Every structure is written in structure tokens, then in C-alpha cells.
């Protein structure tokens, strides 16, 4: 799986990049229409190229909105982003709760206290398979890793039967509080985040 490229980006820069992608998509789609009936046209190739542009645009949007949702509440956006990127590459499952305005501890079964500075290497080690702390949620508050191996409430809503426990827990916690919950699937390595009881994919752009 391609790794997601995170970078801090301003709203104006984000919109500028999206505009460039949209203009490219419109231009490419227009060209496909003009040559649609030509015998030597490789339609599958051109649609594949167009899909790559969409993927890159979705990746930029994923990074920007994730940043905008959490940077007010923790200065460690880049460290968190680096950690889930690495965990995704290795298909190490992870569940990270980023506390925002609502206190979350009354909704969780507390695990092991950490009160450590946020670093990508520490987060990666926590979720390394076999680590006693990996099977649970990591709680982030401001610039601290507060605790690990926390048990979260599962969503009570009907969800896709293919969603695992981590994703159900992310939906549950983000439904009870305004916390943002990051998830990495250990089966696929796919990244996502839950906000307001809804799960959003973190799309990987090409590198």
C-alpha cells in the first residue's frame, strides 16, 4: 500500500491544489471525450490515469481535513501522521483517540497510564504486534500520550458487517464525544478516522 504523504498546509494552499487537480481532471476528461471513438484509443489506460488524479486529490483533502480537525487540540499533528503512516505500511492495527473539547475518560475503561510526550516512534512501538499495550486504544490529550490499552464503547448502530472491533469502537467513541479517532486496519493497512459517529477513509495518494 502506498503511504500517505502528510504535510501541514494552509486553507488557501489546499484550495489552490484542489483547483489544479480539478482543472487537470476536466482537461483529461475532455480529451477522452474527443478521442472516444478512435480505434487506437486505450480507454482503460486513460481512465486509470484519471483515477490516479482523483486519488491524489482525495489524499490532499484527507490530510487537510484531518489536520484542521485536530491541530487546535494538539500540536503534534505531524508526529501522529507519521505514526499512522508507518503503522499502515506495516499493517499494524491501531486505534488512537484524540480528545478535543469533550472529556472522554468517563466513556472508556482505562488501561495503562503513560503521560508521555507524543512521538511517532513511541506510538509505533505501542502498536507493535505482541506489545501488551497494542490491543486497545491510545488516548491523546493536547501534547501527551495519556494512556494506552484503553477499552472504548462500541457503536450501537447497525454498521457494515465487515467492520472490525477497532472501527466499531472508533464509531462508538466519536458518537458519544467530539473526539476524533484514528484507525489503522491490521488486515488491510487502510487508514481512516471517525468523527461524529461517521467513518471517513484516509486515501493514499501516489508517491
Curated annotation (Swiss-Prot):
Substitution effect: residue 41 to K: Suppresses a triple DAC mutant
Keyword Protease found: no
Induction and repression of expression: Expressed under control of the sigma-G factor in the forespore.
Effect of residue 76 to V: Suppresses a triple DAC mutant, 4-fold increased production of c-di-AMP in E.coli
Phenotypic effect of disruption: No effect on antibiotic sensitivity to the beta-lactam antibiotic cefuroxime (CEF), upon overexpression of the c-di-AMP phosphodiesterase GdpP increased sensitivity to CEF. Double disA-cdaA mutants cannot be made, suggesting they are lethal, while double disA-cdaS and cdaA-cdsS mutants are viable. In single deletions of this gene, germination efficiency is decreased.
Enzyme Commission no: 2.7.7.85
Disulfide-linked positions: none
Chemical reaction(s) catalysed: 2 ATP = 3',3'-c-di-AMP + 2 diphosphate
Domain of life the protein comes from: Bacteria
GO molecular function: adenylate cyclase activity; ATP binding; diadenylate cyclase activity
Resulting phenotype, residue 44 to F: Suppresses a triple DAC mutant, 90-fold increased production of c-di-AMP in E.coli
GO biological process: cAMP biosynthetic process
DAC domain location: 63-205
Domain comment as written in the entry: The N-terminus (residues 1-69) is thought to form 2 alpha-helices that allow dimerization and probable hexamerization; this region inhibits DAC activity of the rest of the protein.
UniProt similarity note: Belongs to the adenylate cyclase family. DacB/CdaS subfamily.
Assembly: Forms dimers and probably also hexamers; the dimer may be active while the hexamer may not be active.
Xref: PANTHER family: CYCLIC DI-AMP SYNTHASE CDAS, DIADENYLATE CYCLASE
Name of the molecule in the record: Cyclic di-AMP synthase CdaS
Originating species: Bacillus subtilis (strain 168)
Amino acid at each position: 500500500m502506498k503511504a500517505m504523504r502528510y504535510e501541514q498546509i494552509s486553507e488557501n494552499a489546499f484550495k489552490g491544489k484542489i483547483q489544479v487537480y480539478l482543472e487537470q481532471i476536466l482537461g483529461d476528461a475532455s480529451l477522452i471525450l474527443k478521442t472516444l471513438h478512435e480505434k487506437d484509443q486505450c480507454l482503460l489506460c486513460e481512465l486509470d490515469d484519471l483515477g490516479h488524479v482523483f486519488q491524489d486529490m482525495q489524499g490532499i483533502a484527507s490530510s487537510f481535513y484531518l489536520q484542521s480537525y485536530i491541530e487546535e487540540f494538539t500540536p503534534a499533528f505531524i508526529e501522529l501522521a507519521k505514526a499512522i503512516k508507518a503503522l499502515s505500511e506495516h499493517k499494524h492495527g491501531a486505534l488512537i483517540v484524540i480528545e478535543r473539547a469533550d472529556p472522554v475518560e468517563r466513556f472508556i475503561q482505562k488501561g495503562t497510564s503513560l503521560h508521555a510526550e507524543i512521538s511517532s516512534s513511541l506510538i509505533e512501538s505501542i502498536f507493535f504486534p505482541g506489545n501488551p499495550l497494542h490491543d486497545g486504544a491510545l488516548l491523546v490529550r493536547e501534547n501527551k500520550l495519556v494512556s494506552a490499552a484503553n477499552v472504548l464503547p462500541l457503536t450501537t448502530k447497525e454498521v457494515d458487517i465487515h467492520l472490525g472491533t477497532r472501527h466499531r469502537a472508533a464509531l462508538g467513541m466519536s458518537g458519544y464525544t467530539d473526539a476524533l479517532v484514528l484507525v489503522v486496519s491490521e488486515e488491510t493497512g487502510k487508514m481512516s478516522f471517525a468523527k461524529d459517529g461517521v467513518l471517513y477513509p484516509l486515501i493514499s495518494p501516489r508517491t
